[in-house]
From Swiss-Prot:
Region (Disordered): 69-328
Designated name of the protein: Circumsporozoite protein
Gene Ontology biological process: entry into host cell by a symbiont-containing vacuole
InterPro entries to which the protein is assigned, alphabetical: Crcmsprzoite, Plasmodium_CSP_Invasion, TSP1_rpt, TSP1_rpt_sf
Entry keyword annotation includes Amino-acid biosynthesis: no
Species this chain originates from: Plasmodium falciparum
Region (Required for the binding to heparan sulfate proteoglycans (HSPGs) on the surface of host hepatocytes): 104-111
Lineage of the species this protein comes from: Eukaryota, Sar, Alveolata, Apicomplexa, Aconoidasida
Amino acid sequence: MMRKLAILSVSSFLFVEALFQEYQCYGSSSNTRVLNELNYDNAGTNLYNELEMNYYGKQENWYSLKKNSRSLGENDDGNNNNGDNGREGKDEDKRDGNNEDNEKLRKPKHKKLKQPGDGNPDPNANPNVDPNANPNVDPNANPNVDPNANPNANPNANPNANPNANPNANPNANPNANPNANPNANPNANPNANPNANPNANPNANPNVDPNANPNANPNANPNANPNANPNANPNANPNANPNANPNANPNANPNANPNANPNANPNANPNANPNANPNANPNANPNKNNQGNGQGHNMPNDPNRNVDENANANNAVKNNNNEEPSDKHIEQYLKKIKNSISTEWSPCSVTCGNGIQVRIKPGSANKPKDELDYENDIEKKICKMEKCSSVFNVVNSSIGLIMVLSFLFLN
């Protein structure tokens, strides 16, 4: 049944696609034919118009040239008339006719001016002279006189007046004004300003100066003084204080601290050291001799039962109860176990079920050799809790995944 449905669907899809392609080909062919017809008609019309315009344009230009030639030469002297008579009756091509017309155009033209009515006209007279003009005009008059000039001009006017003077000048202006006055003076300046003011005053002076300021201020004051200085500073402060003192010093520091403290103290000391540590501990104890030297029992370096007991203790630590914290012995054994692989990253949890520890090297001790690491000051420890047994959980997860894959392969 499934095979029949698949064959039917594929056949239907191919049939519909074939119909669509046939329809598409027919439509594009029809559109192409109509487009070609339109292009042919447009091309023919444009070609006809272009040829017609070129033909009539050339004819019109040629006849216009002949007409202009006849118009220019119809009143010339007898040579031109003879040239026209000699050209009449000759059957020559258009090129010769055009050459003769061009020769006529190159001949000089005579000025034909309108003659005045009297018997002795001036051949150079201006034909546009006003017939009502004044016959007593000054021959030296300015030819560029303003025709709109004032006919009632002041005859006593200053001949040396400034031609660029302000026509809107104040008629009531002070005739005795200072000729050297500042032309860029402030028009809004204070008319009651102090005439004895300092001409060299600071232009950038503070406009908000305290009017009650001390007129006898210290002229040697520090110009770089702190503008945000404490106004309530201690007047009895030490004038010889250390200028390089720590600005972030603890304000609650012990004022009775030991002045003879060790200046070379360890800068990488453990900040989380036990505040209740034994103050009477042995200062000469060797922290690295716990399992070395000539110890007794299983601490002897060549004890054959030592590794057996350590492995047994490690197995017992792995089986630690969920409600118990990791013991010091468990921590020490785990540190020895991962001594060569410890780094600044947190190590895996020491147990797979229950409570364990994670350790790492403190960032300040990262450059120390691993043989010189101090477990108290250079190693950081924290407790980790494993709620599920990771080994059993991993086995169950792997089994379920394998079963699902096999079922999917064989059932299909």
